[in-house]
Swiss-Prot record:
It is an enzyme of class 2 (transferase). This is Lipid A palmitoyltransferase PagP. The record marks 67 as: Role in lipopolysaccharide recognition. It comes from Escherichia coli O6:H1 (strain CFT073 / ATCC 700928 / UPEC). Transfers a palmitate residue from the sn-1 position of a phospholipid to the N-linked hydroxymyristate on the proximal unit of lipid A or its precursors. Belongs to the lipid A palmitoyltransferase family. Keywords: Acyltransferase, Cell outer membrane, Membrane, Signal, Transferase.
Amino acid sequence: MNVSKYVAIFFFVFIQLISVGKVFANADEWMTTFRENIAQTWQQPEHYDLYIPAITWHARFAYDKEKTDRYNERPWGGGFGQSRWDEKGNWHGLYAMAFKDSWNKWEPIAGYGWESTWRPLADENFHLGLGFTAGVTARDNWNYIPLPVLLPLASVGYGPATFQMTYIPGTYNNGNVYFAWMRFQF
């Protein structure tokens, strides 16, 4: 191997190491922002929220019919939270909710949610949101062992009433569930 190939390999490795350092620096910055948003939402809420589960739907393409025929798709339960809107108009919320799962067993969930919010109409009360939730849940079929969750969020709302939803990904006959609820801000 000639010297120019060694120099090229050295610079390639060196550039990769520099890039990794920048990625970790950005990850630290992102985590700091995440923690600060949670703390601010906890310490300075603008609203208190009531959560009412509305629907669970098991994607028919991902389940055997005999399974979906037995599943509960009408969850009932409720929850409470507190939330705020940041200077960019984005929503931040802390919540705790319990609902009847697919097997009609209680499933608690608690966490933090964030949505980037758009107000596409002249009426500022109408809003759309897209974001994520990070939290902890527990299920009967897992002996109520706390399980971390990181899921997408989407919403459509008018004023203090918001229809919020997520999708739980999965494999065949497991996961692939659309879950939605109403959130009322006070």
